[in-house]
Amino acid sequence: MSEQKIEVVGKLGSTYGIRGWLRLYSSTEYPESIFDYQPWFLKIKGQWQQVELESWRYHNNDLIVKLKGTEDRETAQLLTNAEIGVDLAVFPELEEGDYYWHDLIGCQVVNLEGYAMGTVTEMMETGSNDVLVVKAGSKDAFGKQERLIPFLYEQVVKRVDLATKTITVDWDAGF
């Protein structure tokens, strides 16, 4: 069996009620999509442990979940703030030009002039488009520590090469 690669897709929040329910914070594009990716793993004391989802529902505008074996508030409290992960193998293949954020994080960003702008450290969602957060190297000639580059495929992002972990952008190094 191949080694699992776990990607964080959410986090458990505070307890809800006395029967072992927990609030859920999903980092998937659509909050309910987190339930499409099973099984879940929780990071407990630095180790990923598989858990089974028993039930979920909306309470007001929050998602709440019940995990198997979590029957009371005290047991649920042990899981508060635990990250929720899933094996990357459960993610569906995307169409060309679409990328999962976890594939872009860690890529080197280079502009059309060949200037190494830094490494993608995270992604941000804005109302109109996603944004690459690029941390510059310590010897950045423009004195930049971080750049925010819109992920506009073809307009700004010219090429994504996941094999070499390189993103080529049409972006002035001074910005």
UniProtKB/Swiss-Prot annotation:
Major subcellular site: cytoplasm
Domain comment quoted from the record: The PRC barrel domain binds ribosomal protein uS19.
Subunit structure: Binds ribosomal protein uS19.
The species this protein was found in: Glaesserella parasuis serovar 5 (strain SH0165)
Any one GO molecular-function label of the UniProt entry: ribosome binding
One of the GO BP terms on file: rRNA processing
Family membership noted in the UniProt record: Belongs to the RimM family.
UniProt keyword annotation of Hydrolase present: no
UniProt KW keywords: Chaperone, Cytoplasm, Ribosome biogenesis, rRNA processing
GO cellular component entries: cytoplasm; ribosome
Name of the protein described by the UniProt record: Ribosome maturation factor RimM
Presence of the UniProt keyword Cytoplasm in the record: yes
Location in the cell: Cytoplasm
Pfam families: PRC_RimM, RimM
Transmembrane segments: none
InterPro entries linked to this entry: PRC_barrel-like_sf, PRC_RimM, RimM, RimM_N, RimM_N_sf, Transl_B-barrel_sf
